[in-house]
Every structure is written in C-alpha cells, then in structure tokens.
Amino acid sequence: MDYKDTLLLPTTDFAMRGNLPECEPARYAKWDEQKVYEKMKAKREKSAISFNIHDGPPYANGHLHIGHALNKILKDIILKTHYFFGQGIRYTPGWDCHGLPIEQQVEVKLGDKKKSMSKSDIRQECRNWAKEFITVQKDEFKSLGVIGDWNDPYLTMKFKFEANIYRTLCEVAKKGLLVERSKPVFWSWAARSALAEAEVEYEDKEDYSLYVAFCLSDAACKKLGVSDAKAVIWTTTPWTLVANQAISLNPNEKYALTSEGYIIALPLKETLINQGIINGKILKEFASSELEGLSAINPLNGRDSRFILGEHVLMDGGTGLVHTAPGHGEDDYFASLKYGIEVIMPVDEAGLYDETLRVKKLLPEHLLNEFIGLHIFKANEKLIELLGDAAVKVSKFVHSYPFCWRTHKPVIYRATKQWFIAMDEPKLSGKTLRQTALEALKSVKFYPEVGVKRISSMIENRPDWCISRQRDWGVPIAFFRDSATKEPIFDSRVLEHVAKVFDEKGSDAWWNLEISELLPKGTNLDPSKLEKVTDILDVWFDSGSTWNAVLNSGDYDAGGYQADMYLEGSDQHRGWFQSSLLLSCAINQKAPYKSVLTHGFTVDGNGNKMSKSKGNVIAPSDVAKRYGVEILRLWVGLSDYSSDLKISDDILKQVAEQYRKIRNTIRFLLANINDLDDISSHFGTLDKWILARATKSFKEVSECFKNYEYSKGFNILLNFLSTDLSGIYLDICKDRLYCDEKDGLRRRSSQSAMAIIAKSLLSLIAPTLTYTVDEAIEFAPDIIKNGAKDAFDLVYEPLVFEFKIDDELLTSSREKFNEIIDVLKKDKIIKSTLEVILETSSNEILANDLDEIIDWYMVSFVRNIESDEFLAEFAVGNDKFKIVKADRYKCPRCWKYAAKIDNDLCPRCAKVLKRV
C-alpha cells in the first residue's frame, strides 16, 4: 500500500523560485497604486517616535550607477527598520538640478548653437535636461524597492526652492559672514569657473621639480657682507614664476650661505646635499630676519622679489625659500597681504596668459607675442629654457594634484574677485563659524564614530568658502551694487522682494527683468545707479541649504529640522555634510542633523575602482534583470558599509545562494502551518529549545539592526536559520508534521513554534527583503497574516520565550553522533539514522520526554545502554553512548524502524490511520 496520501505534506503557493526580475516590477506598481508611503505614514500617525532621513540630492544627470543603488537602498532599509519597529517615518527624495555637470551636457548637446543663445534660453535647456533625468532616475530608484514621497520630491530648480536657497544666502549676508574679495581660489580653466574644495579631486600628475636661483640685490648682498649670492627656490609650477612677487622664509629657522653662493635653510642642508645641489660647505649662518624687506631679482624678468617671513614655510622639502606668487596660492596670498604686496594675475579664465604680461612687464618685450594667449601648461618647457643657468636643477616627478571633479582636468590657483563665507569672523554671538561648527559636531552621533574626527579635521583646516561661480546654470547671487562705489546693497526690503519675485517667476527673473522691475515699490534706490551681480551660487550652497528649503520651510512633509539622519558616501564629509553644517550653523548655530551615517564606495571583486575602460562596471539595472532587486538589497544588507563594498558576479551569486536559503526557510515554515488555526500554549522540549534560541538570536539581530549594523545582524540571523532552525529543528519536526495526527499535540505544538518564528522572522527581514516578505504575506495562512493585507501591516514584536533549557549535553552529543553517522554512511553500513537506536548512560538525557529525544537524534529509539554489539560508541564527558542497529522493522509510512512485524505499520502510524 502507498501511504503517501495519508501523510500531512506541506503545501503553499509561495513559490520555491521567486522569479524576482519578472515579479518585482509588478509588485512595486501595486505598491504605487495603493499609495503605500501614505499608508505607512497613516499607520504610524499616533506613534510617539518619528524618524526622518533628509535625502542628499543626486544630480539630475545620467542613469543610476551602483553607488546610487547602494545609497538609496541603505536609506530605504534604515527607514523601514524604524517603520517595522513601530515608528513613524518621513522620507522626501530630492534632486540637485543646477550646476556644472548638467551645464556641460547641455553645452555638448548645443555645440556652436550656444554662442547665439541668450542666458535665459541656455538656462531653459538646462532645466529641460534636468527634468528629463529626474523622470528617468525616479523610475530607476523606485524599481529598487525604495519607498518615499515620490509624488512630491524636492527639486532645487523649483521656483519656490530657488527662492529659499536665495533666502538662505540673504540670512548669511545679514549675519555679516558674506564677504567679497580678490583671493586665490581653485580655478577650473576647463570649466572657466571657480571651484569649492568639495569640487576638487586629487589624482597623480607628472610635474617638473625645478630649483631656481634668484640673484640677491646689492642691498641684500651688502647686508650679508658678500659680493654675490643667490636665493634658491623650489617650485613644481614653472608657469607661475612670471607672477613671482616675493620669496618667503621661515621666521624661526636659521639660514646659510653655501660655498656655491646659494642661500638655503640650514635644516635642509643634508637633503640638498643628497639632491646634488650643494656640497655641504657652509660659509655663513644668519637669521631669516636679516633678509626681511630686502630683495632678489627674478631671472625671467628682472623684477624685484621681496624677502618676507611666513609661518607656512616648512622644513619638509625644497630649500626653505618659498617662491611666492600671491595670485597663485592661498599661503602666498596671506603671507604677501601682511606686507602689502600687490597680487598680480597674468592668467585668464581659460588658463591662457593675458595682456598682464605686457602691462606688468613680466617677460621681456620680444617674448610677449609668443606667450600671450599661450596655455600655462604649455609654457613650462619654454620658461625653463629661458631660465638658462638660473635653473639649478630640473627633473620630473609624480605627485598628488587637484583636478576638477567634472572636467577631470588639472586645476590652478587663480586670484579673482569672488564671494566667500568667512570662517573666522566672530559674528555668531562672539564666535566664528569655524568654532560654532566644531562645537555643533559634538552633539552629532556618527556611524561609524571615526566620521566625527574626519569632518572636524576638515572644518579646522578649511579656508573660507568660495560660493560664487562664473557660469549660467544656477541660483544667482542676486544682489545689487552701487555702480559708483561697487558696494553691495543688503537692504532687507530689497532682498525679500527679490525672493518673492523668485517665488513666482523663478531665479531666471534676475536676468529676464530690468533692475526697476526687481525693486520693491517705495524704495529710495535709483535703478539707474545700480548694477546686478552676475555670478551664480556654488551648487554645494544649493544642496547645503536644503535643510532650510525642505525641513524648515513647511513646504514638504519631510520631517523636522534637525533631521534625524543624513546618510551619504564618505566623500560627503568634505561635501554635503560640511556645506549643510556650515549654513545651518551660520543661521541657527546648530547642526542640521542629529546623526550622520557614511558608507564606503563600491569596488569590484578585487577591490578595484569601477571604470568603463576596465570593463568592471556593474549597473544596478543589469543586476535587477539577471538576479532581481532583492539580491541587490540583500547584498547591501550583508555588506559592511563602513568600508568599501565589493560587488561582482561571483559575489552576487553567493548573495543569491543566501537569499535562496532564506526564501526556502520561509517557504517551509508557511507550507507546514497551512492548517494551523490557533497558536498552542503547550510546547514540547524541542519547541521550547527552538523558541529560546530564536528569542536570543532575534534579540541580537534586532539590536544590530537598530544600531544599523546590518552585516553583523544578518550573519547572526543566517547562522540561526541554517544551523538551529533548518539544520536541526525543521529537520527534526518533519516526522511529527507529516506523520502525526493532524491535531496531535506534538504536531500543533511544533506548528505553533514555527508560526511564532515565521511572524517574527518576516517582520525582522521586511526592511531589507520587502518584496519577498510582501509576497510571503500574500500567500501566508491567516495565522501569520493576523489581518495583515501586505508587508506594511507588519510590526516587529520581540520574542519573549525564556525557557531554561540546558542544551549543552544535547547539542554536543548530537554533533558527535552526526560525525560518526557520516562515517557509517560513507562506509555504507547504514543509509539513514532511522536504521539505528541510540543507547546512553546519561540520566540527564533519559529524563526527557522519550519521543522528543528520539526526534532530537532522528533515530528510531533511544534507551539505556544494554547491547554488547554496536556499530560505534562515543562519550561526552562521563556520559557514554552506543549506536546500535535497530531491532525492529521499517514502518512503510514513517520509515522509522519501530514496527513489530515486517511490512506492518509502527504503533504510532497505526493509531493515526485508525482515527482517520
């Protein structure tokens, strides 16, 4: 007789294979249609705690890369963690719409056509470009399973948003922190604009290492008591030598005259000997102050180069005499400022030498036509040749050099008139912005903790923030200035009127309207005596003021200010985290965030940066099509985001395997509780054991998730699922689930334990595997749903089963038993553990319910030691065990060797069938 039909086999419509690439888009479309985000807000409306992440806006340019996916998925997991743990959430996604990346793409698209277009038309093209990619990226983000207020995202190019960015600027100006001055700043000659520190990336670049001798003036020689001497400077930028105005010396170091007639810093003597520049013989030592105010002669143009003192002169390389061109370096600028030295700037916005060479006589007359209009980087070789014998030593070396983050061309320092936010003006209740920001960071929690040191160090050492740009696409620095005095006008009525115009017409109005149309009625200002500032704001000012325009304005349902969390890549310590901090501290003297979480960058399986040229780029859309978004989400959950995250096809296959284990565990649980109507309050020993293990594991996992330690939490969870749950308990329970009476006490007890674990498991993994949990709820029996219509009706409730079970002997004896069984199977002595009886001397084990112990070892019987013949024996401490061949017959229904007669049912199975 075939007894298969008498077994209570598992059944569920929750598929073994998820077919994720096909099913996920339809499931998200359903969420969208059902307005799940609104439902989530409503479900937690009465929650005492609400949590918001303020979205760091990506550029509305291009398709998403894997870094975007990592960032948005991690945000989504964290928000949903708070949600499924019973808290309210707010998440308004946003986009950075202005700036160079978009403007460059539009320039490429327009080509020569741009030259004949008005600024307004160019800006409209940029607006259209941004709008197109917002639509593209929004769909791509939503496909990642990310829930948020996608119907009302914030866009920095919205009229009202532009107005609020401008209002933030006005508030900074009113605080007295906004200054306009000529100062060297990072300049992208390729983009023809100033750059902020955050817009500069460092790459290796080959440059000249050049030692140049400047002959001392007669007065300087006389002061040293010599007839001839040369000050030797070192530079890596020969093209700046034409703009040299001074030579800086360290005020605290000794200097020396060598036998070669060279002046050097004494501490660098050995270094220069090793360089082959001097032989080491010193003729005279003197203090740097002896040369202060005297001069040397620039060998390129015969101009005086004054000796000045500066703390910026270090003894870690060069000669200790620093070539000082105040227009081409911040240290040079400040050192020269103290001495009233003129800033000369012979380089135009495109990086070409201009007519300043002629006006200031920076090169001999006969060379001017050759150099004016020449790109500075093409001038190095020509200038070195012109130096002749004054070039003491010339070589090349590779060093880290600043590059424009968008054009990927090397940048220069160039003095131009720009707008700055002052870091060291004591305008904030007697404190500087630098001091206020550093103080505010002390109340911010960082994940990982090292983040606070990193951003604090950057704040401590950063220069004033250059916020002006000479481009088209951005929010204008919309100030009027007096045409005669050039002084900016910060009249509150005027500023607020301009802001209101922007509210209605957008910031394009600054260019489209006449000055008279931009002034409020009743003003005493004469439009004919005013002019407009034409610079635009640094795009980091846009994103840095989003806390004000989104959280503080009341225009969005995005949660409160301060935000509970800012979450971006670790590069944002110098970018968005910092710009947001500075603007919030400038206006409100506090950080815009309560916590900051940073993640590393995505790299390939070998730890290499991804690039198209290497062919190692992995697009999130490709992962979604091949594996499903859920695999990408689990990859984020399994990865330690505090460092760089590796991703490759092999890694994704491993993640897919882990996902398969999770899915199959869920499927097994659902399939085996399909006929359970009520949770039993009676639990057997093994049920108590698994519930106690689940309580402990889930508590550890939930604590990890609450602390955003997802990798650690998932490792604990996966270990529990594979070892305790699937590896032991579910395997053990198959016999009672399939073969016991439908309403048998042991079967219902195990089903109840499984249902309890399944409910907790689903709500615990829902933040990460939302698609899967939603699918599971769709096909789950009512005992699991408990009224839930979808995953978003779930709330995680901690398990509280504190059964005191001393399982040390049980687990250690089971491990040893299984080791021996593996050998017996390998030697083909047995095929199954059901073929044996376990005998033991352990009173502790024998004191348990016999059926529970039989199932624990998955044998046909357990008894006291009585057999002389045995297949194997082992001991655990003082307890002895024997593995004995079963002495009864195999039951054709349950396969246990418990039948008294061959081909007969065992007593248990006979009893079950009798009652059917």
UniProtKB/Swiss-Prot annotation:
ATP-binding among keywords: yes
Cofactor stoichiometry and binding remark: Binds 1 zinc ion per subunit.
One GO cellular component, as annotated: cytosol
EC number: 6.1.1.5
SUPFAM superfamilies: Anticodon-binding domain of a subclass of class I aminoacyl-tRNA synthetases, Nucleotidylyl transferase, ValRS/IleRS/LeuRS editing domain
Extent of motif 'HIGH' region: 58-68
Catalysis performed (reactions): tRNA(Ile) + L-isoleucine + ATP = L-isoleucyl-tRNA(Ile) + AMP + diphosphate
Main location, first listed in the record: cytoplasm
GO biological process: isoleucyl-tRNA aminoacylation
Subunit structure: Monomer.
Comment on protein domains: IleRS has two distinct active sites: one for aminoacylation and one for editing. The misactivated valine is translocated from the active site to the editing site, which sterically excludes the correctly activated isoleucine. The single editing site contains two valyl binding pockets, one specific for each substrate (Val-AMP or Val-tRNA(Ile)).
Record family assignment: Belongs to the class-I aminoacyl-tRNA synthetase family. IleS type 1 subfamily.
Protein name per Swiss-Prot or TrEMBL: Isoleucine--tRNA ligase
UniProt organism field: Campylobacter fetus subsp. fetus (strain 82-40)
